[in-house]
Structure formats: structure tokens, C-alpha cells
Amino acid sequence: MKKEKGSRRKKRVCAFCVDKIVDVDYKDVNRLKKYITERGKILPRRISGNCARHQRRLTTAIKRARIMALLPFTVE
């Protein structure tokens, strides 16, 4: 019996690298909301498609926005 070849997913590119954004701003709430689940968790890199540098900066920006009460810690 022959194995079926799995469909290869297209590699996602980092949206911040494409837009040539160096720093992720914690005040840009609309952009940050794209990388948070409906439960309020930060999306992992393999799902969001960000590079390692921008994923780290995105994480710190989301955490800063949560502390400044721009984003919720959890969604009720």
C-alpha cells in the first residue's frame, strides 16, 4: 500500500518584515489584537508566522499593552 504524500503548507512570512516595521508599538492595539486568541492568549510563532525577532518584540508589546490596560489579560 502506497502512502499518500502530505500536502506541504506554504511557509508564512513575517508581516512585520514585509511591512518593514522595526519596532512593534504597544499602543497599536489594532495590530496587536491580530496576534491574540479569542481567549486572550498570545499566538505562537508557528501559527502567527512571525520571525523570532518580531515574535519576541510582539510578546513584550502585548504584555506592555496589558499592563497599560490597552488590552485585556483575559476575555470573559
UniProtKB/Swiss-Prot annotation:
Membrane-spanning segments: none
UniProt keywords, alphabetically: Ribonucleoprotein, Ribosomal protein, RNA-binding, rRNA-binding
GO cellular component: cytosolic small ribosomal subunit
InterPro entries in UniProt: Ribosomal_bS18, Ribosomal_bS18_CS, Ribosomal_bS18_sf
Single annotated GO MF: structural constituent of ribosome
Top-rank taxon, per record: Bacteria
One Pfam family hit: Ribosomal_S18
Biological process annotations from GO: translation
Gene3D superfamilies: Ribosomal protein S18
Protein's job: Binds as a heterodimer with protein bS6 to the central domain of the 16S rRNA, where it helps stabilize the platform of the 30S subunit.
Similarity-based family: Belongs to the bacterial ribosomal protein bS18 family.
Annotated protein name in UniProt: Small ribosomal subunit protein bS18
